[in-house]
Curated annotation (Swiss-Prot):
Disulfide bridges in this chain: none
One annotated GO molecular function: methyltransferase activity
The organism of origin for this protein: Oryza sativa subsp. japonica
InterPro entries named in the record: SAM-dependent_MTases_sf, SAM_MeTfrase_DRM
Name the UniProt record assigns to this protein: Probable inactive DNA (cytosine-5)-methyltransferase DRM3
Family: Belongs to the class I-like SAM-binding methyltransferase superfamily. DRM-methyltransferase family.
Length: 680
């Protein structure tokens, strides 16, 4: 009999009046909002978004403030018309060939010469077909420099549209030139070198998913000499600080097993990063690194005299400074981790998996929050037809691993045999790159590429072949005819990721939503390889606590391994994800119990203790990439990684390990007492 309990409405785990009161007193970090105090002469907090939007379009902050004071912030069309009108009037006053004068936002008169980005792009009347025509248009009509045009074409490719090229150049100019032309023409060469370095870094940061406003602000603050990694870390730090900096850590005494005196020298105001917990009896503030139970036994040698240095910024000095964003993994095949302490290696096991490519420096910081266990990197191409770099932090044994049987297809041809008849020999792809979710313009792209093949008359130049392959890799297009390309449909994505057929096929869920639900999902063959060691350790079944379960990748991997699931407590805020997992649980006739919880914020200390008591503990705590399956509104939704949610996963791991460790000690003492009693 399958017993499924859904805690979305409070069943399974009772929600008390006290819990509701706690939620009101201690709002969730995701719900925190900064209070903006209105000052005379400045736009109100309600207009800050509108102000940022128009400044991001390239208008002078002073001009935007003046227009907002005159017209208010409710009618965007009126504001835009006023800005364009005043910009046009000011622009006709004088012309300046200096980039410094052109973009000096502190000088209202000079800043008015800058045509807003939207206006510049709208002025493009033609779509040049060849790179030479685009180059000529950018140089003669748009008056960009030769070096700006060369850099844009090199970075975006000759097939990029004029709009994309103009947007790239203008973004670099806005980010890199905030000062005046104070040094005269003698410094132009130096400024040009700095400009193109800034433009290159700007492109990298935009490709990483950061907003233009974030990129422009961080470059202006950190300076053009900062590396891409340093700039990215700074943006991450700002995002983290804005979402959780004002939350206090509430830690009960037995959590840390430390005395009161160990806190006496600590000042809350010095804490750069704070955490949230739920004990109201003993409230203390402590640095984030001390949230771990046995911190003194850790192998990290990091000094503790840097309370104001955000953990996401540490160690960036040791990284390369060449501006490179993509860092290759040392070993892309699974390897043995070297520094799992004996006490950490004991159950309950934990596994945190991240399928989003992030810098090594960030991985180092993540591992420090999980007992300094080194991450294990793997490429899913060794287990499937998906080539994706993944990382896992876990304390699982590594001996006795095995592949899932039957294995998922290892190549595109194995996954989709129908492509054999139409796959061109010059398309050498064997595997797909990622779960592409972008659908805007995909049909037009397929039609354009197909027309390129048809018009070639059977002969494609190497340049066109390279271009077609590049577009196919970006959008994960496959050949469905001699001159026809198509994106993957949801069932094909399910097959690549190792999920059952029609796993995400819910009533009312369109194909795009189905693919979006799989965007950050585990590849079950890859995950199953790491989890396979549990089969011999737990022949009678596993008790699983699954954090950010997504569409159930961890449970499916264990099921494919043939490991019985005694219970799965699944935490995921997406109603779609919960329905998908619940239907799979029922369809596979699982004998255990599924308990679904709709938010990690419900896993308070007393709730975790009740769950451990109810199920007798957990054998493994699995965490993955957070995804709301609604487009996301979290601070790092574009990357699929929410730092705040990761810290909550760490909190749960630490709490569960401590609760179970405490119960084991009590059980041992009780057994010893019973053993001695008969002899007394």
């Amino acid at each position: 009999m399958v017993k499924v309990e859904d805690d979305v409405e409070g069943s399974g785990i009772n929600a008390s009046v006290g819990d509701l009161r706690d939620a009101a007193v201690n709002p969730q970090p995701a719900l925190l909002r900064a209070t903006v105090k209105e000052e005379e002469g400045q736009p109100s907090s309600s207009s800050s978004h509108v102000r940022s939007q128009f400044i991001g379009m390239g208008f002078s902050p002073m001009l935007v403030d003046r227009v907002l004071q005159k017209h208010g912030d409710r009618d965007s069309d009126t504001i835009l018309e006023a800005l364009l009108s005043q910009s046009a009037l000011q622009k006709s006053g004088s012309e300046s060939g200096s980039l410094g004068d052109l973009f000096d936002s502190d000088n209202e008169e000079n800043s008015s010469h800058f045509a807003p980005r939207k206006e510049v792009i709208q002025d493009i009347k033609v779509e040049a077909d060849s790179s030479s025509e685009k180059r000529s248009y950018l140089l003669s009509t748009m008056n960009f420099s030769q070096r700006e045009v060369d850099l844009a074409l090199n970075q975006l490719g000759e097939e990029a549209s004029l709009e994309q090229l103009v947007d790239f150049i203008v973004t670099g100019q806005v980010s890199g030139c905030s000062g005046g032309n104070e040094n005269g023409d003698a410094s132009n060469e130096v400024k040009d070198e700095s400009l193109f370095g800034v433009m290159d870094k700007t492109l990298h940061l935009l490709q990483m998913g950061f907003t233009e406003e974030e990129v422009s602000s961080v470059i202006d603050k950190a300076g053009p000499e900062a590396t891409v990694l340093e700039l990215a870390d700074t943006i991450f730090a700002r995002r983290i600080a804005s979402s959780i900096e004002q939350k206090e850590v509430k830690v009960e005494p037995d959590f840390l097993d430390e005395t009161e005196t160990s806190y006496s020298a600590y000042h809350p105001s010095n804490s750069g990063l704070r955490y949230y917990d739920d004990d109201h009896d003993n409230i203390r503030i402590k640095r984030a690194k001390h949230m771990f139970i046995d911190d003194s036994a850790g192998s990290s040698s990091r000094a503790g005299n840097q309370p104001n240095l955000d953990p996401w910024l540490k160690d960036h000095r040791a990284t390369t400074s060449d501006g490179s964003v993509k860092e290759e993994f040392d070993a892309m095949t699974p390897g043995i981790r070297r520094n799992v302490r004996s006490d950490v290696a004991n159950p309950p096991y934990f596994l945190y998996g991240n399928v989003v490519e992030i810098p090594k420096a960030t991985w180092r910081q993540l591992s420090e929050f999980l007992y300094n266990v080194e991450p294990e990197f793997v490429n899913s191409q060794f287990f499937s037809a998906l080539s994706r770099k993944e990382g896992y932090i876990h304390n699982l044994p590594t001996e006795g691993r095995r592949n899932l049987v039957p294995r998922s297809p290892m190549t595109i041809e194995e996954a989709f045999p129908f492509t054999r008849q139409c796959w061109p020999s010059w398309d050498t792809r064997k595997q797909l790159n990622s779960v592409a979710t972008e659908v805007a313009g995909i049909e037009q792209l397929c039609e354009r590429l197909g027309k390129m093949v048809r018009d070639s008359g059977g002969y494609l130049s190497q340049e066109k072949k390279t271009h077609i392959m590049h577009q196919c890799k970006l959008a994960n297009l496959i050949w469905v005819g001699p001159d026809r390309l198509s994106p993957l449909d949801p069932q094909q994505v399910e097959r690549i990721l190792g999920y059952p057929r029609k796993h995400t096929n819910l009533f009312g869920l369109n194909p795009q939503d189905r693919i979006e639900a799989m965007r950050y999902s585990f590849q079950t063959d890859t995950l199953g390889y790491l989890l396979s060691v549990l089969k011999d350790l737990y022949p009678d079944g596993l008790r699983v606590l699954s954090i950010y379960s997504g569409i159930g990748g961890a449970a499916i991997a264990l099921h494919r391994l043939g490991i019985p699931l005694q219970c799965v407590v699944s935490v995921d805020q997406s109603d779609t994800n919960r329905k998908i997992l619940r239907r799979w649980w029922s369809n596979t006739e699982q004998k255990g119990q599924l308990r679904q919880i709709n938010t990690i914020w419900k896993l308070k200390i007393n709730v975790l203790e009740d769950l451990v008591k109810e199920f007798g503990g957990f054998d493994i705590i699995i965490g993955g990439n957070f995804s709301s399956c609604k487009g996301g509104t979290t601070v790092n939704s574009s990357m699929g990684m929410d730092s705040n949610q990761f810290f909550e996963y760490v909190r749960v791991v630490q709490r569960v390990k401590h609760i179970m460790g405490r119960l084991q000690v009590r059980a041992h003492e009780s057994a010893r007492h019973r053993h001695r009693s008969p002899s007394n």
